Structure formats: structure tokens, C-alpha cells
Amino acid sequence: DLVEEVLESLRQDGYLDDKRACARIALRHRGRQSKSKRYMLRLFLEQGVSQEVAEAYMDQLPDDGESIRELDLSLARGDEKERTRLMRRLAGRGYAPSLITRTMEQIRMEAEN
């Protein structure tokens, strides 16, 4: 079948490489664009990466606590309204509410010292 031949050729040339796709997606979502591991897994799968490769790639991503700290969390030291807005933003990126609260509290404590 011609379609299978074309797909196989693309795989051999590295154009259809799930590991590369994961790396490319992860690169786009680093630093200020950081997302939770759970969110990243969903992105990988939505982009057509196989479940097996996507789950294996998760070990290469920073844990959620580290990735939250990569974000601009200056608002964590702000007033209640700013902190609430930041918490909603982080929740929208797939971070667990308990992790968000704990991390923001740590940042606030560090700022006081």
C-alpha cells in the first residue's frame, strides 16, 4: 500500500519520531510557559505521540515543584487578589492545588527572610 510505504519512509528519515516530537513539545513549554507533567502528557497524546513513548518521556521532565518555580512567581508575594489570580493560572496549567499552595507559601516565607 502506497500510504504505508510513504509512512515507513518518513519514519526511517526521522520525520515521524515520537521521541523527537516529545522533545520539541517540551521545549515549547519550558520556563515561563511551563506546564505540569499531567498537562504535558495530555499535550503529547493530543499531538499523536504514542502512549508508551509519552509516558517514558515524562521521566525527562522536571517535577511539578521545579517547573512551578521556573515561572514568574513574583505575584506570590503580592496581595490576596494577585495570589488568587496566580493560583488560577497555575491550576489552568495542570498543577495540583495543594502543590500550588505549598510552593506559594514557601516563596512567601523566603521573601520574609
Residue ranges of model-derived segments:
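An alpha-helical, amphipathic repeat domain used for nucleic-acid recognition
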Residues: D1-N113
